[in-house]
């Protein structure tokens, strides 16, 4: 897929993966689902679910390093700043030949890399973020999308990003 195709698909994901309602219990269920998927697959990832600025779920699975904690924070900051996936933000910056610093942000606090996805509620918008760190960025992104699609009973095959060319 090209950057433009990826950006188009991610926009579709962000629209389709919206909840009617989302509370602390739903946040915990989302985090637990990601933890179960990662454990079944032997993935060494960090998982974070944050509502507004409140951490609700965090798990670090075998293989995670202290660096992943910082990656989670920085990717989540991208979502909470722009209300779109960190991967979409990174792809757009790359397409435009820009960096986060060009937008007046610090790379120490913002990571435009895949793995954080907005938690959207219909009629409200972005209320938080679900973040995965530990895999290549496209895989982090796809895993977050997979968990959201499973929770919302959406067809993952029509939402998932295709393998890169």
Swiss-Prot record:
<dbReference type="InterPro" id="IPR005624">
    <property type="entry name" value="PduO/GlcC-like"/>
</dbReference>
<comment type="similarity">
    <text>Belongs to the UPF0303 family.</text>
</comment>
<dbReference type="InterPro" id="IPR010371">
    <property type="entry name" value="YBR137W-like"/>
</dbReference>
<dbReference type="InterPro" id="IPR038084">
    <property type="entry name" value="PduO/GlcC-like_sf"/>
</dbReference>
<protein>
    <recommendedName>
        <fullName>UPF0303 protein Rleg2_2653</fullName>
    </recommendedName>
</protein>
<dbReference type="Pfam" id="PF03928">
    <property type="entry name" value="HbpS-like"/>
</dbReference>
